[in-house]
Amino acid sequence: MRIVIAIITGLLLFLGAWLFNQESSNNDTEVKQEQTTVDTTAWIIDVTANLDGERIVNADDEPGNWLAHGRTYDEQRFSPLDQITTDNVGDLGLAWYFDTGTDRGLEASPIVVDGIMYTSGSWSVVFANDARTGELIWQFDPKVPKAWGVNACCDVVNRGVSVWKGRVYVGTIDGRLIALDAATGEVAWDVNTIDKTKPYTITGAPRIINDKVIIGNGGAEYGVRGYVTAYDTATGEQVWRFYTVPGNPSEPFESPAMKDAAKTWTGRWWTMGGGGTVWDSMAYDPDLNYLYIGVGNGSPWNQNIRSPGGGDNLFLSSVVALNPDTGDYIWHYQTTPGDTWDYTATQHMILAELEIGGELRKVIMQAPKNGFFYVLDRVTGEFISAEEYIPMTWATHVDPESGRPVESDNARYQVANPLLDLPLKEQVAVLAAMTAEEIEAAYHKPGPLGGHNWHPMSYSPDTGYVYIPALDMPFGYGNEPEFTYEQGRWNLANDWRLGMPTGDQGVDDKVDGLLRGFISAWDPVVQKEVWRIQHAGTWNGGMLSTHGNLIFQGNSSGQFVAYRADTGEELWSAPAQTGVIAPPISFEIDGEQYVTVVAGWGGAFALTAAAAEGYNLKPRGRILTYKLEGKVELPPVVDIAAVLPEPPPIDATDEEIKHGKFMYHKYCGVCHGPGVRSGGVLPDLRYMASGKHIVFEDIVLGGILQDRGMVSFASSLTKEDSRAVHQYVISEAHRLKSRSGN
C-alpha cells in the first residue's frame, strides 16, 4: 500500500510541476499589439507627445480628457462635464466592455487622452484601448514572477499609469518602474527602484511633475524602510530620493530631515525596517511647486516593539510637503503620532481653496485611516481643523492648539484579552452571552483597514462636499506573545489570536455583522456629515463627482451606481457582475460624455474578510464604459456551483488542531481568509481536492506551486506545523460539510 501511495504521490508531484510550469512567469516582458493602421499610430503619437505639465495644469480647458490620476494635479476627481445629469442619468447604458483576462483585484483609475484610454490591471499589466469602442490597441505584460506576489500584503493590484510626452509609465508589483511607448507599448526604459533582497512592492500610480516621474512603494507589514523616488522621464535616471523614516543612526543621515526624525525614535527600529512606505496618495500644487506625499504605518505595527521608548516616530502617518525638483523637505503634519494601529496617512489627499472664517485658504484635505477628517493649510502645514467621520475608540478629539490627537485611556493595547486564557468552549460561551453591541464595544475602532482606505474620495466645487467611501470595522489589537521578527513574513507584533473566528456560527455571525461601509457626504468647512448612504457591504469603490450634480461609485454587491450629489438619492444602477473597488472617471468624445470604471473584485478586504459578508463575487476583470442610450449588454454569468469534496478524516488531537489554527492565521489567513473562508479571490482551502491533500506538505514546505505564487513556507513552518495547519483546514472542511450538507 505504501508503494502505491508513493507512486501516486510522485505522479501527482510530476504532473503538478509540469502543469504549473506551463504557466510560469519569467522576467521577460511581453507586448501584445493588435492590428492598427498607420493613421491610428500617428494619431496616438500626435495626441500624447504634447501631454505635459502645462496641459495638466490647464486641464479644465479640455474637460473631455482625463489627463492625470485625479484628472488634475489637485486630485479632486471632479469632472466638469454635464451632458449626463440628474434628469437623464436613468438613460445611461453600457457603451462597451473589455475583458482584461485577469482574476485578481482591479483598482486602476484610467487615463484618457483624446480618445485613447490607458489603464492597468493586476500583476501590473498595462492596456491601451480605443476609448470610443473598447478595442484593444496594445497590451503590455511586465512578466512579474508570480512568487513575488507573496510580498504584496493586499493583492497584486495596480492603481494606474501616468502618461507624459508620448510615453506611459507604470510601477510593477516587483518594484520596477517602466516607461512604454504610448503608441506601441514597446519598452523605452525599465529601472529597478528597490532592494530586491527585501519584500518591497509597488501598487500605486506614478505621478509626473516637471519631467520627473515620482514613485513610492509598499511593504511595511513585512519590515521595510519607506521612501519616494524621482526619475528622469526621458532616461530613467534617478534624480532624488526622500526617505520617510530614519535608518541606522550610526551611519550618516541622508538629509537634515532624517537627522531630526531620528530624535523621535527609540530602540533598534532600523533592524525591522521602520516602515513609512508611500504606497498610494500624492498631490501637487503647481503655484507653490509643492509635492505632497502620504506616509504609511510603522513596521512592525506595535510601537512597543518598534520603538519601545515611545516617541512620535516621524514621518510615520504623516502628510509631508517636498520640493519636487530636489526632494527637499518643506513641512509635515503627523496625523497619528507614535502609530501603533496601522493608521496610515497614505489615503487620498485633495487640494482646494475654501473660505474658512471669512478667509480664502489654500487647503489640503484628507480622511486617513485614523478616523479624523483633516483640513490643513497646504502652504505652511498649519492645522486648521479635524473632526471624526466614523465612530472611534482610540482618541476623543484633536486638540485645536497643538493639532495632536488626544488618545483615550484604552487606546494602546498593552493589556491582554482575558478571554485568550480560557479554553475555546469557555470563550464561545462568554461571547455567545454577549450582545453584538457588547462585543463591538470590546474592540478597537477603527481597525487596520481604517475609516477610509485607498479608495479615492472626490470633491464637488458645486456642492462643496467631499464624498468619502468610508468603513466602520472594529478590530482586536494586543501584544503578540514572544514576537520574533521574520524576514519576508508579516511582522505586526499584534496577537493573531484576537482575529481568529471562534468556529461557533452564532458568535461569528455577530462579529461579521459589525462590518459596515457607507458614503459620507462631508462638509469640510463646518466639519460635519451632511448625509450618508449605508451600503450592504463594506469594501466599496472610489468616488467620482460631476458637474451634472452626480456622484458615481461601484460597490461590493456588484453594482455600479449613480446618486444625486446634493442629496444622495440613488438615481441609476447597473450590474457589474463583480465587486467594484476602483474609482470611476468621465470623459467626452465627439460630443458624447462617457463614464468608465474598471471592475474586478479583490484587494485587502477581499482576501482577509470578505467571506463575512456572504457574497459569492468572482474577480471578473473588465473595463466598463457607459453613455446615454448605450445598448450593449454583458454576457450572462455562468457560475459552476462549487461542490465540497469529501474531506479526509481528521487525524489530530484538539491541541494539535488548536496549534494549527494559530499557525494558519499567522501565515495563511491573510490570503486564504480567516477561518479558512475565502473572500473569492484566492482558493478556499476547504474545497481542496483529494490530490491536493496528498501533496499538502509538498505545496506548503516544498514550494511546488511557487510558479503560481504559492511559495514555500519551510523557513517559518516545521513539518509538525504544516501537519497541524492541514488538520485544522480539514476540520473546517468537516465543519462546513456538517453545516451545509455539502
Q: Where do the PLM segments sit?
A:
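Short, conserved, GDST-rich strand-edge loop motifs in beta-rich repeat architectures
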Residues: I215-G226, T266, I293-N313, M473-D512, ...
